């Protein structure tokens, strides 16, 4: 189909032509590039099918990292110290008072695109100019030293009540310095329960419905959880959630069709899933060549 990034109107036209058959019960947007065009044209699309996303005003709260962080700060959700520059002068002023390293992050982007770690004020001002030019509005944040990462994977009904939750921890990533996870594991412990409580409180404040992943980093300085972002769509490690006993796509389909579902009471812990090609192979090739790493990779 036409690229939603390079030819949005053609993409929407193609989509509407496909939906006019009346044979599609629910539209599931699963790629970042498709999300905003579909939300922007929701009135046209809703003539032919249902959309497995929250309404436009609520969707923006998860799609725009700046909006997410403002809601988090207003509701006492632990997150990095964050600034919202609106001009180069704002960025220069922030650069003089923030501690380093600091992070410049686009408010709307996928993965680590446009994210820059800055070592001094000159670096930050240059990073702001580059990111703002390519991606639009950005946030500037304190850097949180990496002590681990947890993801809370959720399905909420129209009243923002949880219907399914799983928690995963990141074991390996590529690049090692920070990137896509190559090995993850479902967990249940005191830290994961804390993360679930914080995530559900945030999503309630956002009035969220549908699926969302809430990402936390463990602050290596004190072991506390810090909100990194909310992913307003299905996540890359979705198969791990399904293998642990929670079929999020089917549950979301049933909820969109029926209005609500019974809560899923539990999931299996200790289930692992890895992205072997090329992710985990690249991790191994870039990791220190130790017996422990070889043994872990071959398990």
Listing of model-derived features with the role each one plays in the protein:
Residues 163, 212, 224-229:
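Protein kinase-like catalytic core scaffold
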Residues 59-146, 158-162, 190-197:
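Active-site nucleotide/adenylate-binding loops and adjacent lid/helix of ATP-dependent enzymes
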Residues 254-299:
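Peripheral (often C-terminal) accessory segments that flank ATP-dependent C-N-forming ligase machineries
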Residues 36-37, 93, 126, 151:
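Phosphate- and divalent-cation-binding pockets in alpha/beta enzyme and binding domains
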Residues 209-221:
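A short glycine-rich, hydrophobically flanked beta-strand micro-motif that places a catalytic Asp/Glu
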Residues 1-18:
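Glycine-rich, highly charged phosphate/nucleotide-binding loops
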Residues 1-2, 22-63, 78-83:
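A short, GP-enriched loop/loop-strand-helix hinge that lies immediately N-terminal to
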Residues 122, 129, 142-207, 231-256:
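ATP-dependent carboxylate/phosphate-activation module, predominantly the ATP-grasp catalytic core
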């Amino acid at each position: 189909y036409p690229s939603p990034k390079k030819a949005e109107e053609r993409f929407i036209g193609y989509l509407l032509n496909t939906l006019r058959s009346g044979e599609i019960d629910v539209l599931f947007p699963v790629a970042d590039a498709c999300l905003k065009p579909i939300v922007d044209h929701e009135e046209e699309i809703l003539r032919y099918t249902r959309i497995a996303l929250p309404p436009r005003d609520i969707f923006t709260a998860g799609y725009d990292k700046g909006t997410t962080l403002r809601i988090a700060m207003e509701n006492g959700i632990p997150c990095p110290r964050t600034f919202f520059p609106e001009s180069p002068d704002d960025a220069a002023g922030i650069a003089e008072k923030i501690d380093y390293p600091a992070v410049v992050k686009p408010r709307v982007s996928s993965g680590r695109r446009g994210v820059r770690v800055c070592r001094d004020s000159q670096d930050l001002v240059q990073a702001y100019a580059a990111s703002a030019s390519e991606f639009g509005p950005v946030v500037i944040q304190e850097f949180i030293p990496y002590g681990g990462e947890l993801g809370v994977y959720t399905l909420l009904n129209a009243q923002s009540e949880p219907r399914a939750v799983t928690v995963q921890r990141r074991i390996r990533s590529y690049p090692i310095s920070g990137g896509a996870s190559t090995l993850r594991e479902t967990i249940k412990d005191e830290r994961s329960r804390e993360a679930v409580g914080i995530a559900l409180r945030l999503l309630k404040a956002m009035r969220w419905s549908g699926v969302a992943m809430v990402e936390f980093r463990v602050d290596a300085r004190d072991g506390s959880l810090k909100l990194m972002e909310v992913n307003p769509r299905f996540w890359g490690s979705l198969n791990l959630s399904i293998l642990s006993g929670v079929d999020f796509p089917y549950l979301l389909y049933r909820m969109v069709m029926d209005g609500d579902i019974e809560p899923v009471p539990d999931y299996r812990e200790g289930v692992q899933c890895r992205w072997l090609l090329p992710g985990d192979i690249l991790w191994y090739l870039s990791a220190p060549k130790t017996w422990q790493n070889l043994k872990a990779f071959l398990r």
